[in-house]
Amino acid sequence: AVVDCDDPQHSIHGLREHEMGLIDSSTYFKALACDHFRRIKKNAYTIVKSNAVNALDDAERMIATEDVKPDVVFFDMPGTLRSNGVIKTLSQMDYIFTPVSADRFVVESALQFVMMFNDNLVTTGLAKTKGISLFWTMVDGREKTGLYDLYGKLFAENDFHVLDTRLPDS
C-alpha cells in the first residue's frame, strides 16, 4: 500500500486516477488489467491520499479496513522538512528511503537531512527508525559513473547506506 502525503501534488494518487480513467474508458485497457490481475492473483495495491499530519492515522484506518493486510506501507512524503507533520511522521517510520540524483544541491540536501535526522532523532531515541537508505534516481546512462563513485565515497565516509539499485531517468 502507499500513503501519498506529498500534498498538494499527490502525484502517486494522480497516476492511479489516470490509470483508472484509462481502464474505465477503454475495453482494451480494461481487458489488459483484468488479465494482469487474474494472472498474478492479486488486486492493485491501495493508494491513500493524505498529508504528513494525518498520514499515520490514515494508514492505520486503511489497514484496519483492508481484507488483505499489506506487508509493507510506503509513505510518499513532501520534499521539504518544513511541511507540517513531516518530521513527526518520519520519526515513526521503521525505514526511510531517500532519493538522490547526480546534482550537487540534491546530494547536499540529502546529506543534511540524513545527518540531521540521525543526529537529532535516531541516536537520541526520539525516532523509532531502524535505518535510512539512500538510492539513486533519475540516473542518466550517459553520465559518467565517476560522478556516482565520487558521491558514493562521500556517502561511505559518513556511513550512509546506499542501495545498489539505480532508477533510470524516464
Residue ranges of predicted features:
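Beta-strand-loop-alpha "switch" segments that mediate conformational coupling across diverse proteins
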Residues: 138-170
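Structural beta-sheet core signal
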Residues: 2, 75, 98, 134-136
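Inter-motif core of Ras-like GTPase G domains
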Residues: 68, 84-104
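Conserved C-terminal guanine-recognition region of P-loop GTPase G domains, centered on the G4
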Residues: 110-128
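Short glycine-/polar-rich loops that comprise or flank the Walker A/P-loop
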Residues: 92-96, 127-132, 159-162
